[in-house]
Amino acid sequence: KPDSQDICFVPDGDYGKFIEHFTGKTFESGNFMDVNGNVVGTHKNQIFYTVGQRRGLGVTFGKPVFVCGKNAAENTVILGENKDLMKTEILVRDVNLISVPELNEPFRGTAKLRYSQKAAPVTVYPNECGLRLVFDEPQRAPAAGQAAVIYDGDYVFGGGVIVSAK
């Protein structure tokens, strides 16, 4: 099954409309940017898009393009090719370690960024903000705000919230 970009409690999948309805706000349009920082179009507002999204962008480029990132402060959405979604390093905050009281040295295990994903080999490093996860193979479309769960074999080692990916 392909990765879902939907929120389970929004039945029609229009989470932008859902947010507008429940906040009572309307949101300003912004710019689509390419991965090089060039303006390539306009969008409804960054709240209407998720990292990894391909459909419903309202722009065409003659090749498949995906949402590769968002900047809420500047209301920009970054578009690129599938290869631009692939990231090997992820920073995680709000860490909850299950197997150890703290991590003082690198840990070798596996991690998942999505529930249905197969756990991927990773080296986990402590850092000043939480953890730095370095995957053996690039992972598709990790997004800020998503959970990262780290495993030691069949057991949960810990996890946290993704802050950024590169």
Q: Which residues are covered by each model-predicted region?
A:
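Nucleotide-activated chemistry modules centered on ATP-dependent adenylation/adenylyltransferase
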Residues: 1-156, 161-166
